[in-house]
């Protein structure tokens, strides 16, 4: 795998969050998305043949979009490049296209470009991608939490195969948490923490279908324990506070977060206000809406 960031992977993973360390390396290890990436799915068959088409993965936070892209990066013989939608402009896209053409011409090697949060690209940036996807200069894998029919230009959308991922159910998240607890190399297994299934279900409930949020919460909760310690429901409740809210700009979760933000300001709670403000900004909310 080629990356824009050439860091020693082992050193990086020592300090990476639990959610990052526990990312599946094989498609068969992806939990809760059997319809999208199960053994008989279109995508699984194309990945096995190393013939990944341009696709758009869409679904709520923590459902496995980046994980699936990472699995493809681990398996493919193609050059794999991550592009940051918030930090890349038209020049970076054109430079990448030139590099992809050279890779194909001189090394007969395809380039796969992964753009996380592709909805953050404006119309001009999305338009620039179109001819390169169309003529096969590179294969595009986009990921978004937003409704692609509203956030992605129709011409580009028509060139991508849409793969919808669902929010993970409680059992799927519990399975992911159990893996993290038992894994001695990448997870928490060497610490010997004791976390009962009811407590794991509480963690899953707090996370609202977001596996990354669940793993982050588990990591924070167990960090307070001694080795071989037991995480109790009481300790988890004290740490977790309110149930984690999702955020969608045009749906119910959007108004939940906005309401919580307003209430925290009225209640003179700066920490809570900053938390909900950060969530809105991170989710792409327009500053003009927030300022109102």
Model-predicted segments: where are they?
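Conserved AAA+ ATPase "sensor/coupling" helix adjacent to the nucleotide-binding pocket
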Residues: 97, 159, 175-189
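Walker A/P-loop
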Residues: 2-14, 45-84, 98-101, 130-135
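C-terminal helical "lid" of AAA+/P-loop NTPase domains
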Residues: 201-206, 212-227, 234-241, 259-263, ...
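A short helix-turn-beta junction within AAA+ P-loop NTPase domains corresponding to the substrate/partner-engaging
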Residues: 78, 153-168
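Conserved AAA+ ATPase "SRH/arginine-finger" region at the nucleotide-binding site
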Residues: 84-86, 161-174
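A short, basic N-terminal segment
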Residues: 1-49
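Short glycine-rich substrate-engagement loop in P-loop NTPases that contacts/grips substrate
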Residues: 36-41, 78-112, 122-123
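Conserved catalytic/switch belt of AAA+ P-loop NTPases
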Residues: 44-48, 115, 119-158
């Amino acid at each position: 795998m080629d990356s824009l960031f050439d860091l020693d992977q082992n050193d990086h993973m020592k300090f990476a969050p639990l959610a990052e360390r526990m990312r599946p390396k094989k498609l068969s290890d992806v939990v809760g998305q059997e319809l999208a990436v199960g053994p008989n799915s279109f995508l699984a068959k194309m990945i096995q043949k190393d013939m990944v088409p341009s696709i758009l993965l869409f679904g709520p936070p923590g459902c496995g979009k980046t994980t699936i892209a990472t699995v493809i990066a681990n398996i493919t013989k193609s050059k794999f490049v991550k592009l940051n939608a918030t930090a890349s402009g038209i020049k970076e896209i054109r430079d990448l296209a030139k590099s992809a053409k050279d890779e194909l011409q001189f090394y007969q090697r395809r380039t796969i470009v992964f753009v996380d949060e592709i909805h953050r690209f404006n119309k001009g940036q999305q338009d620039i991608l179109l001819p390169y996807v169309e003529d096969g200069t590179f294969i595009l894998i986009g990921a978004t939490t937003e409704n692609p029919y509203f956030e992605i230009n129709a011409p580009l959308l028509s060139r991508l195969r849409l793969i919808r991922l669902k929010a993970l159910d409680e059992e799927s998240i519990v399975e992911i948490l159990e893996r993290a607890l038992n894994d001695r190399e990448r997870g928490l297994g060497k610490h010997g923490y004791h976390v009962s299934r009811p407590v794991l279900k509480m963690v899953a409930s707090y996370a609202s279908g977001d596996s990354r949020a669940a793993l982050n919460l588990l990591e924070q909760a167990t960090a307070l324990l001694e080795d071989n310690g037991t995480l109790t429901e009481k300790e988890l409740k004290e740490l977790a506070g309110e149930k984690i809210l999702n955020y969608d700009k045009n749906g119910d979760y959007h108004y939940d977060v906005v309401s919580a933000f307003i209430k925290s300001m009225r209640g003179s709670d700066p920490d809570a206000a900053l938390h909900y403000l950060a969530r809105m900004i991170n989710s792409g909310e327009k500053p003009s809406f927030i300022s109102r």
